[in-house]
Amino acid sequence: FFDADGRLWMVYGSYSGGIFILEMDADTGFPRPGQGYGKKLLGKNHSRIEGPYILYHPQTAYYYLFLSFGGLMAKDGYNVRVARSRTPDGPYLDALGQDMIDCGGRPGSFFRDEDIAGYGAKLMGSWRFDPLPGEENRDSVGYRSPGHNSAIYDEETGRSFIIFHTRFSGRGEYHQVRVHQMFMNEEGWPLV
């Protein structure tokens, strides 16, 4: 992504290693020298966090770090979380003011979702509307394990969109891509 000053960045990582950010050379597409793996933003001890994406929103002057938490399968509760910063390389704070660098599993833990559950503002997760009486032949309606998103800000219209994949009730692990408009609340947090 490009920051407000036109500098190119790459955010990457998942699960065991955590989420990192590197400043890139826009001419070569390679990382700028001397950064190693980059600056760590969050994650430790096999935390199920992946799919980082950063969007700068000029109306709020924040950088939004989108992440997918939890297991990927339909039953595993995959969901999208968000944190924000005034600078591209953080620190990123959630809506409770928690620094995301503290988000991660306990030492020696392995995929303990409860260790990371309190971090990041939850933007979307699984939901379901069951059939009403008289609609017994209709499947439940809803999303299962939405996540692994990207986002875009349209400069011409001033609108923001989130692009993600999701599964559906009664369809197993089959998934599709969805696009939804995002809106900013009065505190500058995205809503879908």
Segments from the language model and where they lie:
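Carbohydrate-active catalytic/glycan-binding domains of CAZyme proteins
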Residues: F1-V192
